[in-house]
Design a protein with these regions (language model features):
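Conserved catalytic cysteine-centered active-site region
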Residues: 38-42, 46-59, 87-140
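Condensing-enzyme catalytic core mediating Claisen C-C bond formation in acyl metabolism
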Residues: 1-54, 157-189
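Flexible, glycine-rich active-site loops centered on histidine and acidic residues
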Residues: 134-167
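Acidic, glycine-rich active-site loops and adjacent beta-strand->loop/helix elements
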Residues: 17, 85-90, 117-120, 145-150
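Beta-strand segments within the central parallel beta-sheet cores of soluble alpha/beta enzyme folds
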Residues: 11-12, 77-85, 111-114, 139-146, ...
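Secondary-structure boundary elements
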Residues: 75, 132-139, 174-181
Length: 189
């Protein structure tokens, strides 16, 4: 395992957005009688938020971003970089981060790129972005992480459909020489 220690970067805030629509696991058409109850008892997951009616991951990211920068009172032109981490990209080309940069009216000088990762994505995105920021050339950045997993798996999938919902998050990072070190332990199994 690789231990990465990053200095001079602070987490200033985190905002999350989930879609309004709720899917009940008891109602999934894939289960035979009694199966849904067993899955719910084992996983403790009765329901999850899912996208419908054209809601996209970008929409969830945008709402999380607007709430976050409003609470932090950050001006858009002070954001130097954004990174989007997901397996649910809506675009192959251009990068989703570049599309989001335009949608959020961020500066054309704002560095924007994607990282394709699933479960460890937020940690990998945090370690990558904070490492870039630690020298002080990037003062403020936003890490977007999220999935619209229900668009990728079938309602007839017994393995993943009952487990994963949809959400988008925005995490604000800022260069700060007095910040507590961030530590990341990386490995792959």
């Amino acid at each position: 395992m690789a231990l990465l220690k990053v200095k001079n970067v602070a987490i200033r805030g985190i905002s999350a957005c989930v879609p309004e629509h709720i899917e009940e696991n008891i109602d999934l058409p894939v289960f035979k009688e009694g199966e849904a109850e067993r899955v719910i008892a084992q996983t403790k997951i009765e329901r999850k938020h899912t996208v419908v009616d054209g809601i996209t991951l970008m929409d969830l990211f945008e709402q999380a971003f607007e709430k976050l920068v409003s609470e932090l009172q950050w001006e858009r032109e002070t954001i130097d970089a954004i990174v989007v981490v997901s397996n649910s990209f809506e675009y192959i080309v251009p990068a989703s981060a570049c599309v989001l940069q335009g949608k959020l009216n961020l500066s054309e000088d704002c560095h924007a790129f994607d990282i394709r990762q699933g479960c460890p994505g937020w940690v990998i995105g945090m370690s990558t972005l904070s490492s870039m920021m630690s020298t002080g050339f990037i003062k403020r950045a936003i890490l977007f992480a999220g999935e619209t997993t229900t668009l990728m798996n079938s309602p007839l999938d017994k393995e993943t459909r009952p487990l994963f919902g949809d959400a988008g998050t925005a995490t604000a990072l800022e260069f700060d020489e007095n910040a507590t070190d961030l530590e990341f332990l990386h490995g792959t199994r």
